[in-house]
């Protein structure tokens, strides 16, 4: 063991090392929370999802097979969902998207909300939470990416970013360039 001189100042660890440890711990905690919240979500084959959308047209998830689909559960009263509305709307312009409005009223109320927010994506109302229960959704927002064969490729609860959702859709397609 080397002798140390008590008069010699101790070498300090660089400050960045402490920051890295703290950032690593924060990411680990956030990842753990995300995993914990996603545990009850549906896995494997996507559960059935069908109903009248906000315009009165019949929509069915199985009719969207062949391309990846974003299935997004949201609520008009949820602030995080409102923060994601623009992401979902932008993604709906070049990907298949089907959303479910959880306990947000009937089709007319949802249509009014969409029009006021200048949003244009298909919405199936779920006033009593029956669809959400089939999918294991206990809180919103919840986002599922369905692969072209109808299997759940990824599922998350909470805030997701537009690039993150687009990346999941791209991966579900097998990493091919998005259609134009």
Indicate where each model-derived feature is located:
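N-terminal targeting signals for export/organelle localization
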Residues: 1-52, 180
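Short loop/turn microsegments at loop-to-beta-strand junctions
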Residues: 47, 69, 140-142
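Short active-site neighborhood of thiol/selenol oxidoreductases, capturing the structured segment around
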Residues: 60-82, 88
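Conserved helix-turn-beta segment immediately C-terminal to the redox Cys motif
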Residues: 67-68, 83-105, 112-116, 167, ...
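Short alpha-helical
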Residues: 79, 104-108, 130, 160
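Short, internal strand/loop/helix patches
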Residues: 111-149
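Thiol-/selenol-based redox modules, centered on thioredoxin-like
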Residues: 145-180
């Amino acid at each position: 063991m080397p002798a140390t001189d008590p008069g010699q100042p101790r070498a300090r660890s660089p400050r960045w090392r402490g920051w890295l440890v703290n950032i690593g711990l924060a990411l680990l905690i956030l990842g753990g929370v995300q995993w914990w919240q996603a545990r009850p979500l549906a896995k494997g084959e996507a559960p059935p999802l069908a109903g009248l959308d906000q315009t009165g047209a019949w929509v069915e998830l199985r009719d969207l097979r062949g391309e990846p689909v974003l299935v997004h559960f949201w609520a008009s009263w949820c602030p995080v969902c409102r923060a994601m509305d623009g992401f979902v709307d932008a993604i709906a312009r070049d990907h298949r998207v089907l959303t479910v409005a959880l306990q947000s009223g009937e089709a007319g109320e949802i249509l009014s909300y969409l029009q006021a927010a200048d949003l244009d994506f298909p919405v199936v109302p779920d006033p009593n939470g029956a669809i959400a229960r089939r999918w294991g959704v206990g809180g919103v927002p919840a986002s599922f990416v369905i692969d072209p064969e109808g299997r759940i490729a990824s599922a998350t609860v909470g805030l997701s970013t537009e690039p993150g959702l687009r990346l999941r859709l791209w991966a579900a397609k097998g990493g091919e360039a998005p259609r134009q």
